């Protein structure tokens, strides 16, 4: 019997006492107070739980975070500290935060930084990347419902500039890895073909029917995952138009809040059966 995976109550309880800007003046906040550090490191432990989990377990973790409404206080505090809410978002190149640092926060290296404030900035930046990577739907919902237009615009531009390409590259690497692990079918058993274009941020999925390929393309926008991927028809063979359009609409809806895997179970076309895609 399968039991839903969960994050420990003790760890989740540490996410309840979220800091706010009202609690600290600028001078104290720059010192990276212990309470703030503990709260942010608790989030880091939460995302560590995602890193080695299966897609099904990640889905359970995401539901816990969303149902508990934990993400809003984190992101509100994050974008206050990093300047997005004041239309003065942190410039990562000036802060000396490169792509490797965005992807990974190193506590030992952080201790050697010239200021506690830069340590805090690095951890916040890494947490935002991990949020986009592991709970993109929850982050996106926060962004869509953000009441401050200035913050919303700033966050989208900042995400596009520094984070989206990294998240997309991670996703496309996952798709390539998944595709490479699929068994090749026999001559009588057709299999789904996957082609990835990293430069154009596209995934092509196709199935051969009568020596022709029926295929779709999934295009990832410049501010992904805040903006959704687009599913478009490339070539339709042997499938009625109405059924094909239903499939495209289904797939578009299924990936609206998805980032980890575009295709995980082998999917197929046939003249009398719909093209079945499972997205996690």
Feature map (PLM): residue ranges:
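Glycine-centered motif in EGF-like
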Residues: 23-34, 39, 50-207, 224-279
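Long alpha-helical solenoid repeat scaffolds
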Residues: 1, 39, 43-46
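Extended amphipathic alpha-helical coiled-coil/heptad-repeat regions
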Residues: 1-11
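Short beta-strand micro-motifs enriched in acidic
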Residues: 219-223
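Glycine-centered tight beta-turn/hairpin loop motif at sheet-sheet or coil-to-beta transitions
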Residues: 209-213
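Ser/Pro/Thr-rich intrinsically disordered low-complexity regulatory tracts in nuclear proteins
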Residues: 10, 17-21
């Amino acid at each position: 019997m399968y039991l839903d995976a969960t994050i420990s109550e003790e760890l989740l309880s540490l996410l309840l006492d979220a800091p706010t800007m009202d609690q600290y003046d600028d001078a104290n906040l720059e010192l990276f107070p212990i309470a703030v550090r503990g709260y942010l490191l608790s989030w880091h432990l939460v995302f560590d739980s995602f890193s080695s989990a299966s897609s099904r377990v990640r889905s359970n973790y995401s539901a816990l975070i969303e149902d508990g409404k934990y993400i809003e206080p984190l992101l509100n505090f994050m974008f206050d500290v990093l300047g997005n809410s004041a239309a003065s978002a942190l410039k990562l190149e000036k802060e000396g935060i490169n792509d490797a640092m965005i992807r990974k926060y190193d506590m030992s290296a952080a201790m050697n930084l010239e200021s506690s404030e830069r340590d805090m900035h690095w951890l916040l930046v890494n947490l935002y990347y991990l949020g986009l990577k592991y709970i993109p739907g929850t982050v996106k919902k926060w962004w869509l419902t953000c009441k401050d237009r200035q913050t919303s615009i700033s966050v989208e531009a900042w995400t596009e500039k520094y984070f989206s390409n990294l998240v997309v590259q991670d996703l496309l690497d996952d798709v390539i890895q998944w595709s490479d692990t699929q068994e090749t079918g026999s001559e009588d058993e057709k299999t789904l073909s996957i082609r990835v274009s990293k430069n154009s941020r596209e995934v092509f999925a196709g199935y051969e029917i009568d020596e022709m390929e029926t295929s779709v393309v999934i295009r990832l926008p410049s501010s992904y995952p805040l903006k959704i991927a687009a599913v478009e028809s490339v070539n339709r063979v042997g499938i009625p138009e109405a059924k094909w359009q239903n499939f495209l609409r289904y797939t578009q809806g299924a990936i609206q809040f998805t980032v980890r895997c575009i295709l995980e179970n082998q999917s197929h076309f046939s003249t009398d059966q719909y093209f079945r895609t499972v997205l996690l």
